[in-house]
Regions:
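Alpha-helical transmembrane segments and their helix-helix packing motifs
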Residues: 2-302
Length: 302
């Protein structure tokens, strides 16, 4: 295969970064209505992905299988160009550093997309809470014989209590710091997955590239704010006994902060610093404006 043919499905790193910068700049100008609609979709689909992962994990007694299927939610967000606040934690700062946006526009985007993501997760949480407590799947049972839907509901409540009270609130300041650190790792991996998907121009390439880091994040049990918006909204609705004040202070706040650092520093800043400047004899100096526009559109900046 010739070099030109082999590069048809591959976006060079400097071109990728230019596309990410352009996308961040365009995202900064998206209307509040579209931020909320696209954010709603992303939150809703991740809520459904969590239910899928838990159901499959409990049914098969193999949680890794659930983690392996979980990334379908992120894949659809990438393919449809929706708004996920954790991805924007990397893109908007890159645009600001390049002079394509401002910090005011960045914070505006983050706030509205965060709200849109939460609305999406909350709607799915209410729907699933009703569904999980109002019926059973014939013939499907967990390891103690309870109907699988009841087992999923119990698992959500257990995760809600463990990831707010047991792991964090009970440890005080150290717990807050641990939630922050796990948020850093989670969004480092998630943004890596989204960025890897953009390196390929083919749908199969995008799916494979984004699947691996996101499966890793899910398997490691790290903290992603949009996933947590679903779990820690559904948990109290189902009756976990955890209140939303505890959720905000001991999970959503430190995890959001950690996700910002993971995306902005470990993906945005590092990629911007090393690939924004084209290196002679390593990366081509010719800039592909068409590719930049394509990448910007692909990242949801339409």
């Amino acid at each position: 295969m010739s070099a030109s043919a082999s590069q048809m499905d591959y976006v060079l790193p400097n071109e990728l970064v230019d596309g990410m910068i352009a996308a961040g700049g365009k995202k900064a100008t998206v209307s509040v209505k579209n931020l909320l609609i696209r954010g709603f979709y992303s939150g809703a689909i991740l809520g459904l992905a969590v239910i899928l992962a838990l159901t499959v994990g409990l049914t098969t007694k193999m949680p890794f299988i659930g983690s392996l299927l979980f990334p379908f939610g992120f894949a659809s967000i990438v393919l449809f160009g929706m708004e996920l606040v954790t991805g924007n934690f990397a893109l908007l700062p890159m645009a600001t550093w390049a002079g394509r946006s401002t910090w005011a526009a960045t914070f505006r985007n983050w706030a509205w997309v965060w709200i849109g993501n939460w609305i999406g997760t909350a709607v799915v949480a209410v729907i699933m809470a009703i569904s999980l407590t109002s019926g059973t799947m014939d013939g499907a049972a967990d390891n103690v014989g309870a109907p699988i839907w009841d087992a999923v509901a119990q698992k959500i409540m257990a995760l809600n209590k463990a990831n707010v009270v047991t792991k964090y609130e009970n440890l005080g300041g150290m717990g807050f710091f641990l939630a922050f650190l796990r948020g850093v790792v989670a969004n480092w991996l998630v943004c890596l997955g989204v960025t890897m998907a953009l390196v390929s121009k083919s749908v199969p390439g995008k799916l494979l590239a984004c699947w691996l880091p996101i499966t890793a994040f899910q398997s490691m049990g790290m903290e992603h704010i949009v996933v947590n918006q679903f779990l820690h909204t559904a948990g109290p609705i189902l009756g976990s006994g955890v209140n939303f004040g505890q959720v905000i202070v001991w999970n959503w706040l430190p995890v959001t902060m950690g996700n910002i650092v993971g995306g902005m520093v470990f993906i945005g800043m590092l990629f911007y610093s090393t690939h924004r400047t084209k290196v002679a004899n390593v990366l081509p100096t010719e800039h592909d404006d068409k590719l930049e526009r394509e990448l910007a559109a692909e990242l949801g900046a339409r």
